[in-house]
A protein has these predicted regions:
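Compositionally biased terminal segments of proteins
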Residues: 1-150
Length: 150
């Protein structure tokens, strides 16, 4: 399983400025603000990375835009608490599986099936929630292919 964090944000201009302040360039690779603005302007699937320089740990930031899959997944996000002060919301595993299936279809990287198998083993996947999206996105055969892999 890859060691990165996928984050979906509804990022307006004010939040963009706060995001840039929260990740100092001395500690993180942060793309130039103009790149983030370009990604914000894309109607679907705007994306950029944040990388912690010391550890190499990466966050893939996906912007909601008008993507119907994001609109579906946002209310289903799961809230996690770390200590008393930190709460984050994470995407449902079905959303992550759908995105990884899309990326696998586009590039056939072996990491995506491995990640999908790990998600199925660790968190499980609600196939009744997944099936309509698999059909809508034309991913049903890839899903079956990955499920049948050893």
């Amino acid at each position: 399983m890859t060691n990165d964090l996928d984050v979906v944000l509804n990022l307006d201009d004010r939040a963009r400025h706060a995001l840039l302040k929260a990740f100092p360039e001395a500690e993180f690779y942060v793309p130039p603000e103009s790149v983030i603005q370009t990604e914000q302007a894309r109607p679907q699937r705007g994306h950029f990375n944040l990388i912690h320089l010391e550890s190499g740990y990466k966050a893939d930031i996906y912007l909601t835009g008008s993507d119907p899959l994001h609109a579906w997944a946002m209310p289903l996000r799961r809230r996690l608490h770390w200590g008393d002060r930190l709460e984050i919301a994470v995407a449902p595993p079905e959303y992550v599986v759908l995105r990884k299936l899309e990326y696998y279809r586009e590039g056939h990287s072996a990491k995506h099936p491995a990640d999908i198998r790990a998600i199925r083993e660790v968190t499980g996947v609600d196939e009744s929630a997944l099936t309509p999206w698999l059909e809508r996105m034309g991913l049903s055969s890839l899903w079956q292919e990955i499920k049948s892999m050893p």
